Amino acid sequence: MKPIIPPQNLSELLERANMMAGISLAQIAAHRGITVPKDLKRDKGWVGQLIEMELGATAGSKPEQDFLHLGVELKTIPIDSKGKPLETTYVCVAPLTNIEGLTWQDSLVCHKLQRVLWVPVEGERHIPVGERRVGTPILWEPDQQELALLQQDWEEIMELIALGKVEKLTARHGEVLQLRPKAANSKALTQSIAEDGGLKMTNPRGFYLKTAFTAMLLNKVFG
């Protein structure tokens, strides 16, 4: 199977994304010679990886935008029959050490969310994975109000991390952005700042967009 050539420009990326609208995941997978999993319990990232491949994304797991040359991050978003997001959206790993002097403008969250191509996909569990269809894509750039909300949450979360209070941060913190354990394996550990300024071991954390925020974004477009 030949790799997909990355899109040369934004209009080519949007054209590819729009061509997928209404098509089932099984059709896309068959076109690429990929087996559709029975369910997503062990293949949680399968849908996103399939869409990335079909669109010619370049980043893989690197900490940069999926289409770095276009300044675009790709996010698949599972939705229900009413078009509402079914789960939070992973943004990136949260830094837990060496964060002195890190500003919102220089953060990976800010970088990743400058411009996002949202690709909605049917996600209700009663629909077999292969039969789930891709929705109409949305190219989103945060407005000033959205950026302010994201920055405020990020700064509050990072301040608590800097004070060694990462364990006190729950998914309830933040209006639009939350911090959650990232590793599938709860035994996975990484270094973080301790309350005495030293280092301690904790579970890796990731930044996620809350569903109320992504629902608002989808609603602005689809109503």
UniProtKB/Swiss-Prot annotation:
Domain of life of the source: Bacteria
GO molecular function terms listed in the Swiss-Prot or TrEMBL record: DNA binding; endonuclease activity
InterPro entries reported in the protein's UniProt record: DNA_mismatch_repair_MutH, DNA_rep_MutH/RE_typeII_Sau3AI, DNA_rep_MutH/T2_RE_sf, Restrct_endonuc-II-like
Main location: cytoplasm
Swiss-Prot/TrEMBL keywords: Cytoplasm, DNA damage, DNA repair, Endonuclease, Hydrolase, Nuclease
Annotated SMART domains: MutH
GO cellular component annotations of the record: cytoplasm
Subcellular location: Cytoplasm
GO BP: DNA modification; mismatch repair
Assigned protein family: Belongs to the MutH family.
Reported function: Sequence-specific endonuclease that cleaves unmethylated GATC sequences. It is involved in DNA mismatch repair.
Record's protein name: DNA mismatch repair protein MutH
Organism the protein comes from: Shewanella sp. (strain MR-7)
